[in-house]
């Protein structure tokens, strides 16, 4: 029996992590975000009602669960408070159940200005960021110049650090990117106006998570984006600016790695990608359009259409190794309903040689030709099925082949957007 579970996306994000975290949150006392910012949305459907969370952990939907934003998250005070207000308007108690690490780096207006100006300057060569300032905020963190949440409550120190930051960022904006400068007074006034609303939620998250573990309580660590977008191990440079792997939960929440008992890898039954970057199994035909239409493949935060393709087992194998995945959850199986045949990526041809795992770096991946294996499809609907034996035989064979290719068992299968539309083969927290 596992006490603490890490939920990770194994592809290029958008795998359906939010629903699964929400479902698992019924069995834990705390849910922790440990990386990313408000650039990724987790979509939940509860009794037919749609909720999109960007910063706040998906456990907020459960009254008895405490939610944490760990130090690995870059925090926009404005985006946070807007999301809190939206949830409160829907009748949820948020502020008494949300704790924010005092050492989270802040996202401020100059980060957004730099992010958007850079993308505009690159034109067709752009990375495809969301333009929300995530990357520049992480840059400040690594350069050891970031303003952090705790600085909001020390105005003199805030002003001192802000002056130095804007000397640098305004030089880049005006002299290199050809964009307007950002006003220090406006940044300061906005931040100081928001600080009192945030103050009661600011805590020593690491210590509080330690105390919960000492009391025998269970924790769920909620990853954002996906392993193939990891800044180190993803299709660099077409990646996000943080580490999206299971190991990042330790550093990004302030807990010891021995606290991570089980890693659940969330995997779509096909593959999607948003924005630029190589995609070996991409479909640019009517089947790709069908997957996008039936799967409603549009970003929950940006609204951008997602590129669609066949399931890539060799890419999943890379994710399995990087994350030490214990078990898989396959989502959106129902999107494949009605296809006469289905193809599954088992490797690549690279310079005439077969490779059974995704290469490193965007250039190498772009040179890789997917090796596909054809399996029979199924005509029956899988929507809402909650027992594995009731799935069509061809759907079961497809899932079994996925597990064979990546070498990890499938513990959960999602057959619809609602939390109850789930097949449980092995419960991550109950065995």
Curated annotation (Swiss-Prot):
<dbReference type="GO" id="GO:0004019">
    <property type="term" value="F:adenylosuccinate synthase activity"/>
</dbReference>
<dbReference type="Pfam" id="PF00709">
    <property type="entry name" value="Adenylsucc_synt"/>
</dbReference>
<feature type="binding site">
    <location>
        <begin position="13"/>
        <end position="19"/>
    </location>
    <ligand>
        <name>GTP</name>
    </ligand>
</feature>
<feature type="binding site" description="in other chain">
    <location>
        <position position="304"/>
    </location>
    <ligand>
        <name>IMP</name>
    </ligand>
</feature>
<feature type="binding site" description="in other chain">
    <location>
        <position position="225"/>
    </location>
    <ligand>
        <name>IMP</name>
    </ligand>
</feature>
<dbReference type="InterPro" id="IPR027417">
    <property type="entry name" value="P-loop_NTPase"/>
</dbReference>
<dbReference type="GO" id="GO:0005737">
    <property type="term" value="C:cytoplasm"/>
</dbReference>
<dbReference type="GO" id="GO:0046040">
    <property type="term" value="P:IMP metabolic process"/>
</dbReference>
<feature type="binding site">
    <location>
        <position position="306"/>
    </location>
    <ligand>
        <name>GTP</name>
    </ligand>
</feature>
<dbReference type="GO" id="GO:0044208">
    <property type="term" value="P:'de novo' AMP biosynthetic process"/>
</dbReference>
<dbReference type="InterPro" id="IPR001114">
    <property type="entry name" value="Adenylosuccinate_synthetase"/>
</dbReference>
<keyword id="KW-0547">Nucleotide-binding</keyword>
<keyword id="KW-0436">Ligase</keyword>
<dbReference type="GO" id="GO:0005525">
    <property type="term" value="F:GTP binding"/>
</dbReference>
<comment type="pathway">
    <text>Purine metabolism; AMP biosynthesis via de novo pathway; AMP from IMP: step 1/2.</text>
</comment>
<feature type="binding site" description="in other chain">
    <location>
        <position position="240"/>
    </location>
    <ligand>
        <name>IMP</name>
    </ligand>
</feature>
<feature type="binding site">
    <location>
        <position position="144"/>
    </location>
    <ligand>
        <name>IMP</name>
    </ligand>
</feature>
<comment type="similarity">
    <text>Belongs to the adenylosuccinate synthetase family.</text>
</comment>
<feature type="binding site">
    <location>
        <begin position="300"/>
        <end position="306"/>
    </location>
    <ligand>
        <name>substrate</name>
    </ligand>
</feature>
<keyword id="KW-0963">Cytoplasm</keyword>
<feature type="binding site">
    <location>
        <position position="41"/>
    </location>
    <ligand>
        <name>Mg(2+)</name>
    </ligand>
</feature>
<feature type="binding site">
    <location>
        <begin position="414"/>
        <end position="416"/>
    </location>
    <ligand>
        <name>GTP</name>
    </ligand>
</feature>
<keyword id="KW-0342">GTP-binding</keyword>
<feature type="active site" description="Proton acceptor">
    <location>
        <position position="14"/>
    </location>
</feature>
<keyword id="KW-0460">Magnesium</keyword>
<keyword id="KW-0479">Metal-binding</keyword>
<protein>
    <recommendedName>
        <fullName>Adenylosuccinate synthetase</fullName>
        <ecNumber>6.3.4.4</ecNumber>
    </recommendedName>
</protein>
<feature type="binding site" description="in other chain">
    <location>
        <position position="130"/>
    </location>
    <ligand>
        <name>IMP</name>
    </ligand>
</feature>
<feature type="binding site">
    <location>
        <begin position="332"/>
        <end position="334"/>
    </location>
    <ligand>
        <name>GTP</name>
    </ligand>
</feature>
<feature type="binding site" description="in other chain">
    <location>
        <begin position="39"/>
        <end position="42"/>
    </location>
    <ligand>
        <name>IMP</name>
    </ligand>
</feature>
<dbReference type="InterPro" id="IPR033128">
    <property type="entry name" value="Adenylosuccin_syn_Lys_AS"/>
</dbReference>
<feature type="active site" description="Proton donor">
    <location>
        <position position="42"/>
    </location>
</feature>
<feature type="binding site" description="in other chain">
    <location>
        <begin position="14"/>
        <end position="17"/>
    </location>
    <ligand>
        <name>IMP</name>
    </ligand>
</feature>
<comment type="subunit">
    <text>Homodimer.</text>
</comment>
<feature type="binding site">
    <location>
        <begin position="41"/>
        <end position="43"/>
    </location>
    <ligand>
        <name>GTP</name>
    </ligand>
</feature>
<comment type="function">
    <text>Plays an important role in the de novo pathway of purine nucleotide biosynthesis. Catalyzes the first committed step in the biosynthesis of AMP from IMP.</text>
</comment>
<dbReference type="InterPro" id="IPR018220">
    <property type="entry name" value="Adenylosuccin_syn_GTP-bd"/>
</dbReference>
<feature type="binding site">
    <location>
        <position position="14"/>
    </location>
    <ligand>
        <name>Mg(2+)</name>
    </ligand>
</feature>
<dbReference type="InterPro" id="IPR042109">
    <property type="entry name" value="Adenylosuccinate_synth_dom1"/>
</dbReference>
<keyword id="KW-0658">Purine biosynthesis</keyword>
<dbReference type="InterPro" id="IPR042110">
    <property type="entry name" value="Adenylosuccinate_synth_dom2"/>
</dbReference>
<dbReference type="GO" id="GO:0000287">
    <property type="term" value="F:magnesium ion binding"/>
</dbReference>
């Amino acid at each position: 029996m596992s006490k603490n579970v890490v939920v990770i996306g194994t592809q290029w994000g958008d795998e359906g992590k939010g629903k699964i975290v929400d479902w698992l949150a019924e069995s834990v006392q705390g849910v922790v975000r440990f990386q990313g910012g408000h650039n990724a949305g987790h979509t939940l459907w509860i009794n037919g009602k749609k909720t999109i969370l960007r910063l706040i952990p998906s456990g907020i939907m459960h009254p008895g669960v405490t939610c944490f934003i760990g130090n690995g998250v870059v925090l926009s005070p404005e985006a946070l408070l807007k999301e809190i207000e939206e949830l409160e308007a829907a009748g949820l108690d948020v502020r008494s159940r949300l704790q924010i690490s005092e050492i989270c780096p802040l996202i401020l207006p100059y980060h957004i200005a730099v992010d958007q100006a850079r993308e505009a300057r690159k034109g067709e060569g752009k990375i495809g960021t969301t333009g929300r300032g995530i990357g520049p905020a992480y840059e400040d963190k690594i350069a050891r110049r970031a303003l952090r949440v705790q600085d909001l409550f020390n105005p003199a120190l805030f002003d001192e650090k802000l002056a130095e930051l804007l000397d640098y960022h305004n030089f880049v904006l005006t002299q290199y990117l050809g964009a307007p400068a950002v006003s220090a007074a406006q940044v300061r006034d906005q931040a100081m106006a928001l600080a009192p609303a945030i103050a009661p939620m600011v805590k020593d998250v690491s210590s509080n998570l330690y105390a919960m573990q000492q009391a025998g309580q269970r924790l769920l660590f909620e990853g954002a984006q996906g392993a193939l977008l990891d800044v180190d191990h993803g299709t660099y440079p077409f990646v996000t600016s943080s580490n999206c792997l299971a190991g990042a939960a330790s550093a990004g929440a302030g807990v010891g790695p021995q606290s991570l008992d089980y890693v659940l890898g969330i995997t779509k039954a096909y593959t999607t990608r948003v924005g630029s970057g190589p995609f070996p199994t991409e479909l640019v035909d009517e089947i790709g359009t069908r997957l996008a239409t039936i799967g409603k493949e549009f970003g929950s935060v940006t609204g951008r259409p997602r590129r669609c393709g066949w399931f890539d087992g060799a890419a999943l194998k890379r994710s399995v190794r990087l994350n030490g995945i214990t078990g898989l959850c396959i989502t959106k199986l129902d999107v494949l309903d009605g296809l006469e045949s289905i193809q599954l990526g088992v490797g690549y041809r690279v310079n005439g040689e077969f490779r059974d795992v995704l290469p490193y770096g965007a250039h190498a991946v772009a040179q890789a030709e997917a090796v596909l294996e054809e399996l029979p499809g199924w005509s029956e609907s899988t929507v809402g099925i909650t027992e594995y034996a009731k799935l069509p035989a061809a759907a079961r064979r497809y899932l079994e082949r996925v597990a064979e290719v990546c070498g990890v068992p499938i513990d959960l299968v999602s057959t619809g957007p609602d939390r109850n539309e789930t097949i449980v083969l092995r419960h991550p927290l109950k065995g």
